[in-house]
């Protein structure tokens, strides 16, 4: 059970960010699945999902965007993928960090729960919906509540859902809940006119029988509704 506290949006100019960790890994999900990446995990989240198994609060430290860039450069010499995750990245003003990373030639992916708007009016200018592009910012949304903030929805290049076999709406094959968080009437769906990727991932219940049921439920939904089945490969290859 996740007991990490809910933290409100942090108003700042983005010159200082609360960071949990920076690490080199393989992106295990979403449109860049399988791509070597540096993850910047920011501290704190505006939600408290009971089923979340990610630590995003302990041992936090403050950093400037430039210091984070230096960490990235030490880990990935050639310009490549940087994933900003959390917690919830949009809880903080990440505009200066994203701008700096793009200026240095990196491609940036942001993983968000979709509840908070972008930190600045000009943030959208750095974003793209076409994941074939590089050296742009891409927003991937994994909804946890019943609504996605409209300002974020317009920037989302892909949606992803983690699904349990006993929490599926048969009408559209998507989850009723995400990580046990309350949602009314159920977790937010992509807009009706959304024609970009929607990924379904079986929830890891740490139980073989339940995991098999979760996988079969995802397969059924993908076959029926055309979603993309995706396994969390970072868990399969034992990377963070």
Question: Can you say where each PLM-predicted feature lies in the sequence?
Answer:
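Conserved Radical SAM active-site core
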Residues: 2-6, 12-24, 36-135
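Short boundary motifs at domain starts and secondary-structure transition points
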Residues: 7-11, 30, 189-191
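Short beta-turn/strand-loop junction motif enriched in small, turn-promoting residues
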Residues: 24-28, 145-146
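Short secondary-structure boundary/capping segments within folded domains
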Residues: 28-32, 44, 220
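Short glycine/proline-enriched turns and hinge-like loops at secondary-structure junctions
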Residues: 31-34, 153
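Conserved AdoMet/S-adenosylmethionine-binding subsite of the radical SAM
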Residues: 90-240
């Amino acid at each position: 059970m996740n007991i990490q506290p809910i933290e409100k949006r942090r108003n700042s100019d983005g010159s200082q960010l609360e960071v949990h960790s920076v690490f080199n890994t393989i992106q295990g999900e979403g449109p860049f699945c399988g791509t070597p990446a540096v993850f910047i995990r920011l501290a704190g989240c505006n939600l408290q999902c009971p089923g979340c198994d990610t630590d995003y609060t302990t041992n936090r430290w403050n950093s400037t965007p430039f210091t984070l860039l230096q960490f990235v450069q030490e880990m990935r010499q050639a310009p490549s993928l940087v994933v900003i995750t959390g917690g919830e990245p949009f809880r903080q003003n990440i505009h200066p960090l994203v701008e700096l990373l793009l200026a240095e030639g990196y491609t940036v992916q942001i993983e968000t729960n979709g509840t908070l708007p972008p930190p600045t009016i000009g943030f959208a200018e750095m974003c793209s919906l076409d994941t074939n592009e590089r050296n742009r910012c891409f927003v991937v949304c994994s909804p946890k509540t019943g609504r996605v903030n409209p300002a974020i929805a317009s920037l989302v290049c892909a949606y992803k859902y983690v699904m349990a076999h006993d929490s599926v709406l048969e009408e559209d094959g998507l989850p009723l809940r995400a990580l046990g968080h309350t949602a009314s009437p159920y977790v937010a769906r992509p807009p009706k006119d959304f024609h970009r990727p929607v990924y379904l991932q079986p929830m890891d219940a740490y139980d073989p029988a339940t995991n098999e049921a979760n996988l079969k439920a995802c397969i059924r939904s993908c076959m029926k509704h055309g979603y993309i089945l995706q396994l969390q490969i970072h868990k399969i290859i034992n990377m963070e």
